[in-house]
Amino acid sequence: MEVILLEKVANLGSLGDKVKVKAGYGRNFLLPYGKAVPATEANVKAFEERRAELEKAAAEKLAAAQARAEALEGASFTITSKAGEEGKLFGSIGVRDIADAVSTGGTEVEKSEVRLPEGPIRVTGEYDIELQLHTDVEVTIKLAVVAE
């Protein structure tokens, strides 16, 4: 299946690229989320007419993400949770908890933007958490998990 990308998609291409993808990926992800349109002649013409508008919107998204990254650069946050004697948490700290803690600090962060490659946090301590605010914008924050 050939599609035209309407925005930058990680590991696939950027705005305006005509790429070949598997039918399921196109039908179930790219098309429903508005990230691409099928590469028919009519869609190619329509895309070329809207290209400047789409590029402007993409530039605005990137600028907004960079502004959020500057606000978060070097920031540190603290989450308190119940823990046992050796610092092991009763439960865990997940992406939603981290997103809520950062959002209460004044900069809105979605839970899908928080990256925890090693899974949820289950022990007290200090952690470097990576936030991917845009496909091109990443920022690292410090998170301290302390016992109540």
UniProtKB/Swiss-Prot annotation:
For this record, an example GO cellular component is: ribosome
**Biological processes per GO annotation:** translation
The record's keywords, sorted A to Z, are: Ribonucleoprotein, Ribosomal protein, RNA-binding, rRNA-binding
Name of one Pfam family that matches: Ribosomal_L9_N
Q: Which InterPro entries match?
A: Ribosomal_bL9, Ribosomal_bL9/RNase_H1_N, Ribosomal_bL9_bac/chp, Ribosomal_bL9_C, Ribosomal_bL9_C_sf, Ribosomal_bL9_N, Ribosomal_bL9_N_sf
Gene3D superfamilies recorded = Ribosomal protein L9, C-terminal domain, Ribosomal protein L9, N-terminal domain
GO terms (molecular function) for this protein are: rRNA binding; structural constituent of ribosome
Q: What does this protein do?
A: Binds to the 23S rRNA.
State the family named in the UniProt similarity comment for this chain.
Belongs to the bacterial ribosomal protein bL9 family.
Q: What is this protein called?
A: Large ribosomal subunit protein bL9
The species is Marinobacter nauticus (strain ATCC 700491 / DSM 11845 / VT8) (Marinobacter aquaeolei)
